[in-house]
């Protein structure tokens, strides 16, 4: 399967600033929903644990359908915004849905509402996230800017939404959803008027002027490197999510009161997100010099150290220090995976590879690992479970050192035609 997009790229265009705001508006909604939905469903929606579980199960299950489908559609559409507009317009209805549809229907059939809500939110978020991400990455290749610099908008949105969401939830719980509606409206406006792509450089992001047939997509599954990348993501990023799921319980065990532990955790998380935001700016410069494959391996090494270190930490100070390493991990993996897929695969199927290797495989693994890890926490405790999780990450990272092929640095946007690292 030959890589495309070898044509020299023209000088980068000036179109950049709309994309960080696109990232900001989308991930503002993301943080609001995943940060406060559970609390709202309990306090306002009066859902029990089983009903709330159905919402998240539907989101997780249907993501296995939406993610690969959206990947193929995105590769077909390339820079056309049909799917992006569908997602942003659907997000504009979040406020009206939860205010005027969800609550009245809860009194009629609560389980049906839970299923419909899961489908609706999965379409916008679990499926939609890869559509947003791959579009901005492709735009970065065509326009000549760094994806990581745009992604800073998403990191900033996480900090802003965490703070603003808590304040407006206390003021009026339903207002969190109207904040999403406002953000989605701005996102739609950005897609309409601001997010411009230099189509003269479209070949740098995969020229699909010729029909993208299913046989090309089918060849992905015959590539060893695709399976190696999937294994790497399963053994690192899926473990990352599983490790984080109940970390707050482990963290609070170092405190005499749950309230003190919760407050300290919020401060630590804010510091971690702030560090992530700051490191997003220099990370593309770093990855351009070390290579995206090496960036992925560095991510795996740091993650293994953090998980094993947490298990062996003698005091709270070490736990906090190791937790802050996550601020390094996210910029590393977000920038590296985007560049690696662009440089190691045919960019015409960029979105499909991204959706399948880094989202689809990860979702299945998180679903399986979450149950296994939960049982291990109860059976052998956090410390021993963390040692097992850390060992898995270490083994998979070592495997990647020998298995993952080197990317094409020019196609990945790491170096120019002369071989010089981009600044």
Regions found by a protein language model. Name each.
Residues 89-108, 302-314:
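C-terminal ends and interior cores of transmembrane alpha-helices
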Residues 75-89, 288-300:
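Cytoplasmic membrane-interface "Motif A"-like loop-to-helix N-cap segments
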Residues 7-60, 64, 225-255:
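Helix-loop boundary and gating motifs at the non-cytosolic
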Residues 119-154:
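Cytoplasmic helix-loop-helix junction between adjacent transmembrane helices
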Residues 348-379:
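A late C-terminal transmembrane helix in Major Facilitator Superfamily
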Residues 2-13, 195-230, 256-257, 419, ...:
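Juxtamembrane intracellular "pre-TM" segments in multi-pass secondary transporters
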Residues 167-184, 375-393:
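A membrane-interface helix-boundary motif in multi-pass transporters
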Residues 54-74, 270-282:
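Central cavity-lining transmembrane alpha-helices of secondary-active solute carriers
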């Amino acid at each position: 399967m030959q890589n495309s997009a070898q044509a020299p790229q023209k000088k980068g265009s000036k179109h950049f600033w709309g994309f960080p705001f696109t990232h900001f508006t989308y991930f503002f909604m993301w943080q609001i929903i995943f940060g406060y939905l559970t609390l709202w469903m309990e306090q306002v929606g009066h859902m029990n644990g089983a009903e709330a579980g159905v919402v998240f199960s539907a989101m997780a299950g249907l993501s296995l359908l939406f993610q690969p489908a959206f990947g193929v559609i995105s590769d077909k559409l390339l820079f056309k915004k049909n799917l992006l507009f569908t997602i942003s317009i659907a997000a504009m209805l979040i406020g009206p849905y939860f205010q005027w549809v969800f609550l009245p229907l809860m009194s009629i059939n609560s389980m049906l509402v839970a299923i419909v809500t899961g489908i609706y939110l999965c379409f916008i978020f679990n499926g939609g996230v890869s559509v947003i991400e791959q579009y901005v990455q492709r735009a970065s290749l065509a326009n000549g800017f760094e994806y990581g610099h745009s992604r800073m908008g998403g990191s900033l949105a996480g900090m802003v939404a965490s703070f603003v969401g808590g304040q407006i939830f206390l003021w009026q719980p339903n207002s969190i959803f109207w904040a999403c509606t406002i953000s989605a409206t701005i996102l739609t406006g950005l897609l309409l008027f601001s997010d411009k792509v230099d189509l003269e450089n479209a070949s740098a992001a995969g020229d699909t002027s010729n029909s993208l047939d299913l046989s090309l997509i089918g060849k992905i599954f015959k590539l060893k490197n695709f399976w190696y990348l999937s294994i790497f993501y399963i053994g690192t990023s899926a473990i990352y999510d599983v490790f984080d799921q109940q970390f707050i319980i482990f963290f609070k065990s170092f405190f005499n009161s749950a309230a003190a532990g919760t407050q300290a955790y919020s401060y630590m998380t804010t510091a971690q997100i702030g560090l992530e935001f700051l490191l997003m700016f220099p990370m593309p410069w770093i990855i351009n010099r070390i290579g995206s494959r090496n960036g992925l391996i560095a991510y795996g090494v740091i993650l293994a150290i953090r998980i094993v270190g947490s298990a062996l930490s003698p005091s709270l100070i070490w736990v906090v220090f190791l937790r802050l390493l996550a601020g390094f991990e996210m910029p590393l993996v977000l920038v590296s995976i985007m560049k690696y897929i662009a440089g190691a695969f045919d960019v015409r199927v960029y979105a499909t590879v991204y959706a399948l290797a880094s989202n689809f495989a990860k979702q299945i693994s998180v679903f399986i690992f979450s149950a296994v890890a939960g049982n291990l926490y109860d059976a052998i405790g956090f410390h021993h479970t963390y040692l097992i999780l850390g060992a898995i990450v270490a083994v998979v990272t070592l495997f990647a050192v020998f298995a993952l092929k080197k990317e094409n640095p020019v196609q990945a946007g790491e170096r120019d035609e002369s071989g010089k690292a981009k600044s």
